[in-house]
Amino acid sequence: MTRLRIDLAYDGGGFYGWAKQPNLRTVQGTIEDALHKVLRVPTDDAAEPLRLTVAGRTDTGVHASHQVAHLDVSDEVLNRCVGHMTIPVTEALTRRLKAVLPSDIVIHGIAVAPVGFDARFSALERTYVYRVADRSSEVDPRLRGCVLTVDEALDLELMNRAASLTIGLHDFGSFATPNPGGTTIREVKTAYWRRVPITPLVPDEMASHEAYRTPSLESGLVVFTIVADAFARNMVRSLVGSCIKVGSGRKSLEWFAGKMAEPVREGSSGPIAPQGLTLEHIAYPADDQLAARAEAIRAVRTL
């Protein structure tokens, strides 16, 4: 049996999240169907389930520019994808998947995973970014599927004061959907808001010599970046929504601090729309630390 590491990206707008669900288009379901096709394994073959384990289970409408999954597959089945090609089996599988997957999923690479690697439990940290266009932003319509537009002027200083309260080990019960048997305790390493500088006008080099704006799709956007060891369900979107309420003046900084101090879930700190959120990066330790990391992270965290 071989464990493969799969690095991929996807536009989440057309999916009901990562996790496979009956009769719904999901990222996991789409890739697993493609694997069954290219490896010629029946979908009901219990001996070869071809089931993916993922680093971050994204929700409906959430994107990923860097996602990681692992797959356990027998050597006999894996070798089927080589066919007449004289290339490594991982490259052959990458090519065949790219040929059958839809354009909103991209496989960046497949490799044999190091010993002890677990896509979910070996991860050191995950980075999410949420993009917002407020009244001061220049909205590029090409980004409408991955940016949330709000008709408000946002105070980034207040929003950063709120975000700073999340850094460290906390119970994020006010900002997460309860998970029976799980915990909402997480360690946030970085959390901050910034506005992408608006691209200056520069002379056009063409004959008209008219000023034009250099192409920067994120010019003027308000961007939230958060890094943590792991995230509870809906945690990032709920934090973003609450920070926006503070930045727009609809809620006070004291209200946000109270939600952090008293981890009780209620409607005012619920998740904001998904389309602005992207899973940007998954980081892993050195190969010789993968197994130890996976064992440690499986333990239930306490404050």
From Swiss-Prot:
It comes from the Bacteria. One of its GO terms (molecular function) is RNA binding. Keywords: Isomerase, tRNA processing. It catalyses: uridine(38/39/40) in tRNA = pseudouridine(38/39/40) in tRNA. Its EC number is 5.4.99.12. Disulfide bonds: none annotated. GO terms for biological process: tRNA pseudouridine synthesis. InterPro entries: PsdUridine_synth_cat_dom_sf, PsdUridine_synth_TruA, PsdUridine_synth_TruA_a/b_dom, PsdUridine_synth_TruA_C, TruA/RsuA/RluB/E/F_N. Substrate binds at residue 128. The keyword tRNA processing applies. Homodimer. Formation of pseudouridine at positions 38, 39 and 40 in the anticodon stem and loop of transfer RNAs. This is tRNA pseudouridine synthase A.
